[in-house]
Curated annotation (Swiss-Prot):
The gene is rpoB. This is DNA-directed RNA polymerase subunit beta. One of its GO terms (cellular component) is DNA-directed RNA polymerase complex. Keywords: DNA-directed RNA polymerase, Nucleotidyltransferase, Transcription, Transferase. Residues 1073-1097 are annotated as: Disordered. NCBIfam families: PRK00405.1 (NF001616), rpoB (TIGR02013). It is an enzyme of class 2 (transferase).
Amino acid sequence: MSSSAIQVAKTVTYLPDLVEVQRASFKWFLDKGLIEELESFSPITDYTGKLELHFVGSEYRLKRPRHDVEEAKRRDATFASQMYVTCRLVNKETGEIKEQEVFIGELPLMTERGTFIINGAERVIVNQIVRSPGVYFKDEQDKNGRRTYNASVIPNRGAWLKFETDKNDLLHVRVDKTRKINAHVLMRAMGLSDNDVVDKLRHPEYYKKSIEAANDEGISSEDQALLELYKKLRPGEPPSVSGGQQLLQTRFFDPKRYDLGRVGRYKINKKLRLTIPDSVRTLTHEDVLSTLDYLINLELDVGGASLDDIDHLGNRRVRSVGELLQNQVRVGLNRLERIIKERMTVGETDSLTPAQLVNPKPLVAAIKEFFGSSQLSQFMDQTNPLAELTHKRRISALGPGGLTRERAGFAVRDIHPSHYGRLCPIETPEGPNAGLINSLATHARVNEYGFIETPFWRVENGVVQKSGDPIYLSADLEDECRVAPGDVATDADGQILAELIPVRYRQDFEKVPPEQVDYVQLSPVQVISVATSLIPFLEHDDANRALMGSNMQRQAVPLLRPERPLVGTGLETQVARDSGMVPISRVNGTVTFVDATAIVVRDEEGYDHTHFLQKYQRSNQDTCLNQRPIVRQGDPVIIGQVLADGSACEGGEIALGQNVLIAYMPWEGYNYEDAILVSERLVNDDLYTSVHIEKYEIEARQTKLGPEEITREIPNVAEESLGNLDEMGIIRIGAFVESGDILVGKVTPKGESDQPPEEKLLRAIFGEKARDVRDNSLRVPSTERGRVVDVRIYTREQGDELPPGANMVVRVYVAQRRKIQVGDKMAGRHGNKGIISRILPREDMPYLPDGTPVDICLNPLGVPSRMNVGQVFELLMGWAAANLDCRVKIVPFDEMYGPEKSQQTVQAYLKEAASQPGKDWIYNPEDPGKLLLRDGRTGEPFDQPVAVGYSHFLKLVHLVDDKIHARSTGPYSLVTQQPLGGKAQQGGQRLGEMEVWALEAYGAAYTLQELLTVKSDDMQGRNEALNAIVKGKPIPRPGTPESFKVLMRELQSLGLDIAVFTDEGKEVDLMQDVNPRRSTPSRPTYESLGVADYDED
């Protein structure tokens, strides 16, 4: 396959840096966020006011991290830097100032790739989308169908304030969902006179009723209003004027307790048309009065007042790493402040130093808690480069301060018109999280306020202005403009060609002449996310299948020999580069040295820059990370050039699967219901072979009876089993291990209780002889095998941090090559997924007119009902490209080049391919896109022509090796005594309610009886059955299942007198077989009972 790629598109706009959202946010935290927090806590004064501690936030510094990224991963450490901040302790009485640099904690640092390394594991902080602070106006209908309006002032932190109207035209206010208070009571408590309020309102007559209501309640002065406020907010406490004053002050006017944030101030100013400066982040009288005025205008339906849509992206903002971390630092500093105040009060004033006051523990704990256990700090999905990139661009509505799955309704999950170009309408999980977890669109970015913006070209008099940088608009700015889609047809000068253009204006569609268009979208791809933009012919797929295609590309396993797609969208290179999986040249220069582990580039000044390559590293998902150089010694390179391919990359492009020859035809029922029939070639030629690296770990602990020992001297183990172990008892690198083999030999001291009485007697007579030990070695689990690729030993002597109680930890990494096999899951890029049902010899596969056997047979019935026709376009375009020996890039949404353009393009390519000498059979005008195949077993042609072509097919991470499982006897649940579930617990298969109905329907009574008793939770019965099988005797009759006894006990515990009786009315004791004496006779078997016995029963 030659590497020439044809670009079927007019303009290519380069995407922005795709991980920018993570990096920019963390940079903001280091530059501004951390300083803001430190300075907001300064100064801290003690309770007497004598001492003050100032943090000089702008002078904080970070020390060099103790380990670099690779070292931190290897040692299971955190890649973090120590934070120091200058503190000044001022003694007000003596005027003495002590200044000192104080350690305040460790801050995990972001790697270049936008991830964090916490305890050796790479983690990602997911962006959270939350409701923006500001003021919101809503309407509600009461029981009688009358509309009432309300206004909520939502701060970044602090108490919510809600104004509402009622049927009597009175205005009320609630603070944090407490009881209603007359709105005028709050005005008076805030020190506003009646005239102050009335002068500010455009329709004061509506408000006068509330003034009268307040007067009728006898609240006419500020003091009475404060008392009333205190009574409502703190019921049950004795009210006082000073208490009311303090309550009001702390709730709304104290910057430490109430903060609108920059965003909240910006939104309130915008909505209420105010000009209060950015620095005022608490409520002002003006805010409250303007809110009241707007609410009255809404109620009277005048003055252009409008309601807010809370699902509009102008009212939702993104909190990225920096802000989430800043909030966590605030929590830590709050705890620290309390400690400092206590220490100031307790300590000796003269001898105190800042270092004695500041204890780093609370801050360290808060940061650790955030990175270790927050819902938004996630173990990075490293299955392939696309999965990694998508994880960093994920936007979640869940998490602290966000929604919960159960409470989120349909409105929140739905696609909103303002998502256009900001959040992808396609990529979201299936299941309970649908719509709550989204992906950032390709060109979107997050602005300084946390709102998502998307770029446009300006249009002037119907001409698109493409010179200079595009203009980024947030959702609420865009609503006021007429925006045309990115696939409008233009001439070479940018003049829009059509007479009427469909535009979006105020979340609606209308058609306008080109002169009225304000902006045009940058690119047709900007609506969708990165994963979705890799699907060619996306516009021909149903959205549900495109969603599955986007999600399944992230589950593709990196293959041993990746192959980039024949038909791509042109974004493959950027995805590979921005994922951080491929090393990129930092300078212009020449390659002076290349081998498997490093590449050296010499720049124009003669300095060498070394790039080390990852070799067979284990990823978080046990896939293999490996980099292969693609430059040669002496090659010139430029800044930004890809030097090596990472996993699932080829030629600097992302390559998740293989291009294979596919026929859409049924074959002997082997592709019924989405099953896939594949050729043996995929196995023999290692097309879908992948490397998986498993990690096994064992620690030698200090026990009460003495230390555990890692050793080669293992009791009762044959010498041949120890052949691959070194003198310490650890497996050698390069050894091939099967299930049950010893990886690390370990012995544990046996306790006295483990010994039989005769041994204890001998011990007592002869004193301490050789202490007995038990074999506790690390062995390969039952279904695994592979080659040992790495062994790491951690001990205290080497300075490694070990878990408490451990003296030594040994880790063994075992790599296995997994060929494709029956039961593995495969998928295309269009949501066409299936399970391999049979692997056929290539001589039996259907073959083409030139004798080439196809690789995969898919069921044609999988296409029409699912409406993912994109796969057929890809198939035929791939067929043409393979025969023309080129690769094709097609940007999705191509109607701007004319109607039915995809079809015309594919047809033109097929015709061109068929025009080559000797290739006229490729395209049949009578049956375009189909060929007459022959059966590989008989050589006879099939009845109908078949669609054949090349498609990019992936092997997904759901491998049958990890799922297949069998149980003979194993562990049981404690209460119900039923077998556990799942492969990890060595569990059984659950026979549920419906399966019981199926057996009942057949009348298979005895099968059902043993499934519900001896094969499940009849404890005595199952032991006797096992015994009988071993001794070859007939199986005894089952007894009572344990779950039935549990049910009886539960009913009895409710106080119900419930018991089991025989026909004669004799009570059956269900507990008699719990402590069976040796003397109890075994139960009768079916064979031992005669016919007469059955009649008695």
